[in-house]
Each structure stands twice: as structure tokens, then as C-alpha cells.
Amino acid sequence: MASNKVIGIDLGTTNSAVAVMEGGKPKIITNPDGSRTTPSVVAFKNGEIQVGEVAKRQEITNPNTVRSIKSHMGEEGYTVDIDGKKYTPQQISAMILQYIKGYAEDYLGDTVSEAVITVPAYFNDAQRQATKDAGKIAGLDVKRIINEPTAAALAYGLDKQDKDEKILVYDLGGGTFDVSVLELGDGVFQVLSTNGDTHLGGDDFDQRIIDYLVAEFKKENGVDLAQDKMALQRLKDAAEKAKKELSGVNQTEISLPFIASNDNGPLHLQTTLTRAKFNELTHDLVEKTKIPFENALKDAGLSTSDIDEVILNGGSTRIPAVQEAVKEWSGKEPNHSINPDEAVALGAAVQGGVLTGDVKDVVLLDVTPLSLGIETMGGVMTKLIEKNTTIPTSKSQTFSTAADNQTAVDIHVLQGERPMAADNKSLGRFQLTDIPAAPRGIPQIEVTFDIDKNGIVNVSAKDKGTGKEQKITIKDSNGLSDEEIEKMMNEAKANEEADKKKKEEVDLNNEVDQLIFQTDKTLKDVEGKVSEDEIKGVKDAEEELKKAKADGNLDDMKAKKDTLNEKVQAVAVKLYQQQQSQGGEAGAANGDASKKDDNTVDGDFHEVHDDDKK
């Protein structure tokens, strides 16, 4: 039976998390490692797909390890090549989602089929569609795609519905950056504006440390570590660790022994990185977040004095220089009441609760982050829907032909803020044909844009004269067809079955090893106390099981395991009965002794151990 719960998933660049509503509150579900977040890392090893911490641990040694795949969602033509097979970002993301879905099901004790998944507010249509496709491949019906800052605001404001507040969410994650301004009041969470950069995050801060270490090492030793893949991976791990440590201390040691070698022998990287140096290396990255910060306020028609609370979200907001900058720009001490690693998943769970009716009196009004329009004469982008328009929404505009007797029009759909079509993101093209021949400017072509609650775009074009209509759901050129998604779903299901079988195999092997160990122990205990035939029967069954284990036939192993188990139990029971019988005889003898006359002299006694009997 499927659970009626809608889980909330924060599908992050660096880490992911999942939450569910319980008792009217969102709760993070821990993964099998006991952690509240899961590294967004996938590794392929010996035909097995591994996700999370186990995958992250082998980044240095396993070249078939994929991280930060979110940075490539919706990217045209991007694939990952693993052992000659190409995987799209949607497929890799689906593997992460499948793993999360699995441990959420273990926690809930039910199958999970529905989810709310979060995306950066500044994700375009192609990136949103790719995220939805990833969910579908993983076997999830994605009920809603919501923006990460909005989700963080839901987590913050769930128990503050009686307040009227304007809040600014500054969200700096592993690979993306967003700023959203929201108004909260009477259970309504209304997004006023959003801005950001989908290619700016903690990974960039790590890279600055890596570049610095590479340059310093080359200067000292004449060796370029950037050319050595394994050394580079060790540097990545060290940079991430140093960045985190510098959030709590003023300096940290970076020690990487045997990082390289030259004619004189092995070389070691040993250095101290101070917070001041780290701030110097990353100052421009922090400053890069200022323009979206200011634009979000400007688009909302507000100044910093109008903002009641500034919420920090995303692991990278733990960087002291980031916190100081936000405090300086906003003139307010940022609110630290929500966990920046968990807030988005918690907010997604709240939205899941809204959809199932578990959460009452909460309304979420989000916006489209970028303007939408079509290309018109002269290569101009004509906007139909302006950025920061509340969604869902629909807008129509009438256009005409550009030439006499034109019988078809090409509709080129665009997303962005630039005046010229070529400078914006192309979402797709379609054609309206069979327009009756007429002088230019006479045919009336009505173009309608619909944006659904997930921020996904549908466009239609209608000839008002004939009533003929053509419509499409926008798919990026790297988007997946329904057939491709179906195929990937089947592959994901097959992988899930293979993973399940692999786990069963490991569990069975462990049970067999444990039984063999127990058998050997039991045989020692019963030596000389049961018949030789019984002992031979156990030993023969044990050898049969060992042979089945060596052959790797799971069904045979199960059968032989059950047989051996029965025989071991039988001799163990017999030994127990013998001991009981001996105990009874000893008790009877003691009873007879107690019937002797009362002229008994008390004497000293000592306990007789088995060793004393020998």
C-alpha cells in the first residue's frame, strides 16, 4: 500500500535532504548512515550504483564518481560518460532521488510515490522540466516544484502565521545563489520578487582555495597539481574541509602527504590557510551576490528598512564573510533560527502537507523568475509575461504576419531580460501553418503563454480567422521525450531491483557466515555428548552449505542454510535435554541426603566447578 504522505525533497548541488509532515510539523528523515543530509554524489563500481557518503568516500580513487550534477540540469547536450554509457543529468539526479525515496519508505514503512521537489528560484524552464523528469525517472509523481528560498520561508513562517512580515531570504548553496523577497500574513506566503545566479555557490569558494594551493605548490616545487586527477581530487576534499573549518576558527592546517613526486622523491603539501587569506581569495564572489540582493529589493519596490527579517539559507551562508556582508547590506543581524542545511527540505514537506490537507490555512503564491516572450521582427524579444509575475498565470497577445501571402509563422519562445532575442535563453520553437494567404498585417495570430504552478511553460498560437490552433509544452532541446523518460524509468527500476538483489545476496552471505561460525562452536560444545552419526550429519550439511556459497547460487544457499540450521538446532536441543536430565538426577540425590537423621554436624563446604571435577 502506498503512503498518503507527500515527501519534501531538497535536491541540492552538494547535499540533499528529505522531510515529511508528522504531528503537524515537518521532520527531517535521516539516511541509513544516520545523517540528516546526504551527499549528492553517485559512484559506479563493479556494475553497482552507489549514492551518498559511500560514493563520496571513493571520489579520490574511483574516476566513475559524479558530483554537483545539479549544475548541469537542463544544459544542452551534457552527458556523463561511464564505461562507455552516457547518462543525462536527469538520470544521475534520479539515482539520488531513488536513494532518498528508498530510505524515506523504510522510515515510513510504506511505498512513497509523491513528492515536492525544490529548485533554485532562478532556474529557467528547461532546468525545472529536467528536475521534474528526474523525479519521474525515480518513480516519483512530482506534485509540485517550488523555489528553494520560498521553501525556506515556509519552514521559517509556519508557526508565525499570525504575524505580518516582509522577509528577505538569502540562499547561497553549493552551486546556486538566490535572493527572494516575501510577504507573510494570515497564512499567505507571497513572493514579491526573486533574483539570483544559477552558477554561483560553495563550489566556487572551494575552487578559489584549490587554485591558490595549486599556484603555491607550483611556485615552490615546479609541479602542476592541476594536471594530476587524483591530486586534484585530494585538493578538492581538503579545500572543502578547510572552508568549513574556517567558519569556526581563524586558521587551519592543510596537510596532504605524498601529493606528488619529482626527481628528488616524494613531495608533500603542508600549509596554513588563514580566514583572512580565504576572505581575500573569495571577496569578489561575496560581492557578486550584492547585485541580485539589490535587484530583488528593487523589483519588490522595497528598501532594506522595509524588511523585517533576513533569513540565511544554504550551507555556504555559514561563511563569516557572507554573514558580515549580508548584515552590512541589509542593516540587520541575519536570523539564525532555521538550520541552513535543512530548511528547504522542511519547507518542501510543509508544501506537501498543504497538498494533502495536513497543513491548513497556508497559501503559497510564487513568481516566475524570468520574463517570457517571443521573437518578433528584427530579432527583438517581445515580452508577454514579465519577471516576478505571480504564478500560475496566463497572458495572450495578438500578432500578425510580416510578409504578404505568408501562410505559416514560426513561434520562437524565449526567456530572459535582454531586449534582443539572441541574448536570451531559447526555450523552443514551433510552427502555425495553413494561414490563409493575405496581405501582411491582416491575419490575426493570438499567442498565449500559460505558466503552471511548477513554473513550467505552455505556449499556444491560434489563427483567429480560421480557429486553427497549435500548442506545445516547452521542452529544452536537451529535454527528454516521454519515450526516453519511460526507458529511463525502466532502467532505474531495473537498477533498483539489482540493488535489492545485491543487498539480499550480501545479507544471505552474512547469515551463512554467521551460521557456519555458530555450527563450529556448537560442534565443540557437543563433542562426546551426542552420537557420531548426528555430528557427521551436521558436518556434511555444513560442507554442503560451504559448497553452495562458493557456487554463488542463492536459492541453493537458502535451502542448504535451512537444512544445516535444522540439524544444528536438533543437536543443541538434545544437549540441552541431557543437561536438564543430569540436573534432575543431581536434585533427587540431594533430596535423599536431606532425609538423613538430624544428628548432622555442620561443616565447611566449597563450590565444585567443572574444572575441579576433571
Swiss-Prot record:
It comes from Fructilactobacillus sanfranciscensis. Residues 577-589 have a biased composition (Low complexity). GO terms for molecular function: ATP binding; ATP-dependent protein folding chaperone; unfolded protein binding. Acts as a chaperone. This is Chaperone protein DnaK. NCBIfam families: PRK00290.1, prok_dnaK. The keyword Phosphoprotein applies. The modification Phosphothreonine is found at residue 176. Keywords: ATP-binding, Chaperone, Nucleotide-binding, Phosphoprotein, Stress response. Residues 576-614 are annotated as: Disordered.
